Amino acid sequence: MRYGSGLLEEILRRTDLVQLVGRRVKLERRGRVMWGLCPFHKEKSPSFKVENERRTYHCFGCGKGGDAFKWNMEMEGLSFPESVQKLAGEAGVELPAWTPEDEAREQKKKSLYDIVEAACVFYETQLRGQVGSEARQYLKSRGLDDAAAKQFRLGYSPSNNSLIAHLKAKDVSLDDMVTAGLARPGEDNRAPRDFFYDRLMFPISDSRGRMIAFGGRGLSPDAKPKYINTGETSLFSKGQQLYNFATARPAALKDGSIILAEGYMDVIALVRSGFEASVAPLGTALTEDQLHLLWRTAPEPILAFDGDDAGLRAGYRAARMALPHLKAGYSLRFAFLPPGEDPDTLIRTSGGGGMKKILDSAEGLARVLWRVETDGKDFSTPERRAGLERTLGEIVSAIRDGKVADYYRREFEERVFESFKRRAPRATQQSRKTEGRNFRRDAPRFGAPLESISPALKAS
């Protein structure tokens, strides 16, 4: 439903923003402005201000800001319509009546949430029963006990269409099961069947903690693919969600940091070792929507990737995807694990302390881009060095924020200069005196449109 600007303005006018923010942040008055410690990042001195007159909040440290609608969206994980509805109710503003179509659509969605939740409970029950013994044994082999299974609501999907029978007994129609992504319709005179069978189940929730989908790991050696997710539904789009986000969000807002691992088991291992603000994408490379979800909780999320070539390529893809969205104070950091290790295996062998060392040494985005383009490569000829400069120029050109792009340009210029200055012919005494002063004039200038893409980028 669309809301007119006049209605939205009336809701904001009736909302006491200081009181709203004050429920979560201790505020102190300085003149007509209220100040407090920013809830979006760690700080020791208050740089977060709230102004009722302007009806806005803003942090001078991390740049977060907005109005009452944005506050509820950030702090409670609400969508914009949900934030409008909540504030309107608190402010006593009557919203336009829903059409019958609006009401039917909302009721349908609510019904689907209930169905997915019922499936989650069913899978949990199966894991604890006799049919789930193999799944429990697998969890044990990965160092996870019953408490871990309960904490993450892990489950098991049998291979006998038992979910369909269970939901039918609860008066759930087959059409609704299919719509929720829990069943496959029958084809060619074959009976409908469960979408997941003989798999360890990882429930996926939305940002408010409502169950919306599942990831399933095959337990049979012949299971292909090893992992599958619920298909796209009206509740779930895998490129817009992150595993464990609803639980990780409060911890991330408190600590100002969030970790993105590669898979479900990595997240579970991280959380169990004390890294509560840990999430994972859902079988895809990091998407723009997921990047913005991360930035809503922390200005510099840490991406924890395997330390092999595949992990480095994954980090490079994430870095290139993020370039157009970079802005002052918001970037990515990368923690590359030793070859052959992932967070789950590293924590099992080295504990949380070993993982902390890796996270503490996380590299900045610019450093990772430089590494991928230069590590192990020969730049002994002018043509190869020119090719590197061309590729770095493309990277800078992809950054839309002018100020951030300028800093990347400077950093790459300095790295090129430091890397190649020793290759130059012996300078005269006079040229050595002026070398430093002339760097800005003579150094390569990155950012112009490029004619080609580097082989490294094509390979990624």
Short names for language-model regions:
Residues M1-E103:
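N-terminal structured subdomain of primase-like DNA metabolism proteins
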Residues S5, D206-S207, R249-I258, A285-P301, ...:
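A charged alpha-helical hairpin associated with nucleic-acid processing machineries
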Residues I11-R14, G31, D102-Y113, G129-G132, ...:
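Conserved phosphate/pyrophosphate-binding and hydrolysis machinery centered on Walker-type P-loop NTPases
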Residues L20, D67-W71, A118-F122, E134-Y138, ...:
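A general alpha-helix detector
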Residues R55, G89-V93, R136-S141, D146-S162, ...:
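Short, conserved phosphate-binding/catalytic loop or strand-edge motifs used
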